[in-house]
Amino acid sequence: MSKEKEEIKIIAQNRKAFHDYFIEETYEAGIELVGTEVKSVRQGKVNLKDSFARVENNEVILYNMHISPYEKGNIFNKDPLRPRKLLLHRHEINKLSGYVSRKGYTLIPTKVYLKRGLVKVELAVAKGKKLFDKREDIARRDAKRELEKQFKEKQLGI
């Protein structure tokens, strides 16, 4: 296997997290799933809306991540919103608990993806944005878009 960038297939993204939070740092975590949940994730039936993680008893638990029941799973299907354990190294968990203990910081999943056949979650340490921060970001984005438009028109000689 080459040392180049590994193949990653993104299953779900939490775009709203980038709008509602300042992302400080991201971590890659494995996730503890049962067989029918893995099959459902591979079909792309995952929703990260309103999901978050907490550090409890030196474990990171993910809440409110919706994985739709697998159609052919019948009795083996679990509750779609059940809490799921995230798999991280001890030093990463200690670092995350240090971040979360500070006021205003939380853990938000930003992506669910497949890496070498394994389901992974990108977990972000995030701080909530205030309303004026969101407006500021929108104004900055609009100004950048306007500048690019003017530059493009100038290049084309319009």
Swiss-Prot record:
This protein's GO cellular component annotations are: cytosol
List the lineage, top down. Answer: Bacteria, Bacillati, Bacillota, Clostridia, Thermoanaerobacterales
Q: What is its main location?
A: cytoplasm
Species source reads Caldanaerobacter subterraneus subsp. tengcongensis (strain DSM 15242 / JCM 11007 / NBRC 100824 / MB4) (Thermoanaerobacter tengcongensis)
Describe the family membership recorded for this protein in Swiss-Prot or TrEMBL: Belongs to the SmpB family.
* Location in the cell: Cytoplasm
Q: What does this protein do?
A: Required for rescue of stalled ribosomes mediated by trans-translation. Binds to transfer-messenger RNA (tmRNA), required for stable association of tmRNA with ribosomes. tmRNA and SmpB together mimic tRNA shape, replacing the anticodon stem-loop with SmpB. tmRNA is encoded by the ssrA gene; the 2 termini fold to resemble tRNA(Ala) and it encodes a 'tag peptide', a short internal open reading frame. During trans-translation Ala-aminoacylated tmRNA acts like a tRNA, entering the A-site of stalled ribosomes, displacing the stalled mRNA.
One Pfam match: SmpB
* GO terms for biological process, alphabetical: trans-translation
HAMAP family linked to this entry: SmpB
GO-annotated molecular function: RNA binding
Q: Does the keyword Cytoplasm apply?
A: yes
In terms of superkingdom, the source organism counts as Bacteria
Among NCBIfam families, the record links this protein to: PRK05422.1 (NF003843), smpB (TIGR00086)
| Database matches in SUPFAM superfamilies | Small protein B (SmpB)
Q: Keywords for this entry? A: Cytoplasm, RNA-binding
Name listed for the protein in its UniProt record: SsrA-binding protein
